Amino acid sequence: MTTFSMTVTGSLPMREYVPIAQQAEQYGFDEIHVSDDLIMRPAWPILTLMATHTARVKLGPFIVTPQVANPVYHAANLAALDELSNGRMVCGLGRGGFNQMLGVAKAVKPVRALKEAYLLMEHVLAAKTEPFDGEFFQATADLKFQFPAPRRIPIFIGTWGPQMARMAGGVASGIKADCIGSGAYLSKLRNEMLAGAIEAGRDPSSVKLIVGPLSSIADDRAGAEDCIRGMLALIQPFLAPMTTEAGLDPEAIDAAYRAYVSGDLVRAKALVPQKAIRAFTLTGTPRDVIEQVEELIAAGADHVSFGTPTGPDPARAMHLVGTQVLPHFRRN
């Protein structure tokens, strides 16, 4: 059965996260993913609130990055929250989207570095006693948590790139591929992930594919599309190589972005083509979105995560997904 989750960002007042988590649990979402963006409220305190006010839904940061903090720090937070939530934590680990703000202009050996970060998290969560000696990360034999980490917590690699997907298939629980609405592109990533699992001698069925499209759901399609166009105008420049795969014009992408950052939202939205909405998002009425989700499942998605901005009215969007979209897939 397909797993369903929703993704929230750190853009909201802290008081709003508990009711959101409780509503998501009531609607039957399986998981809630919290973005850990450098310039917004961090995921860990939000997840702490959610863990103490829910009982069933799984929770996790998607994604944390070793560019912001050492993998051991992320692993310690993850283990502590797994204890608090009675074993409900999951996690995403990736390169991060704001590295340039930290002076990281170009990553060095990004696939190898992220693999090491993953392996170090696994190392300390498993309470291994030997040293960890990597090219990018090290830990002495003395580095071990002074509290129990009772289980192997699922950790997914956040990526929409083929090389990272192949690496993840060899070591991780799977991948989370955000901003993908295209079944064709998703199928390519899945093939890379499964190839990585086979190369590593793993059972391919043991690695899972989470897809996290940007989402805008409303009672009318026009309102949903208007909402998502602004988001796309802002983030399209950061979606390579998927923009090339989708056949989008680089000059139009740049023009939409410049219009957005200059405050001309009307022009920015007008410059976002329909095929961008189709390539990166789940957008429209519940009926529209059901058809799009079915395409992603047919392409190999094990788990669909409804991403931001959710819709012009986020509460209404959650209601529509919870009362119309999820029940459709639970029945089938």
Predicted regions and their residues:
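Active-site-adjacent structural elements that line small-molecule/cofactor binding pockets in enzymes
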Residues: 1-332
